[in-house]
Amino acid sequence: TRTIDGVALEFQMVPETEAPAELNVMFPERKTLVIGEIATCSLHNILTPRGAQVRDSLAWAGYLTEAIRIYGDRSETVAASHCWPHFGKAEVRNYLTLQRDNYKYLHDQTIRLMNKGLTQAGIAEELVPPPSLTNEWTNRGYYGTYSHNSKAIYQRYLGWYDANPANLNPHPPAERAKLYVEAMGGAD
């Protein structure tokens, strides 16, 4: 807790979620929690399509649990960077809980399917969130999706290799195309 220019602030560090260094800020006198980007109006990316380190979806869910525990009963407003505010203790708690449940479900079900031997592509096809999560507009995949986020979680734990030896050291696309043409009897 810090007082800056007469305003009391409480900080919750939430590293390795949306960014390597991220934090939430509580304004206790205003009963307002600024949740940063760990709760938004859509499922967030666990790995950005443009590239970055894979984010820790399990820690992400854990920090949302911590925010609910620390601030849930004290917050009457929650504001997020890329979302409209939510008002009322019940709505704040519901919003944060559903966001948390979404990331936890995504993580846990990806791990379950990995343990069943599914590949990244197989998990992306198999994993479908339940209506209890997707009925909430702010949990839907308008930004991040279950498909590419499950692949990111797979990558975080098992890397890029899919256990198919043909994919370990593949030919570049141009060379592979020549080999396909040759295997089909040539260009003529």
Model-derived features with residue positions:
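Accessory terminal helices/loops
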Residues: 69-77, 84-188
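Metallo-beta-lactamase
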Residues: 8-116
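Gly/Pro-rich turn-and-neighbor structural signature
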Residues: 1-9
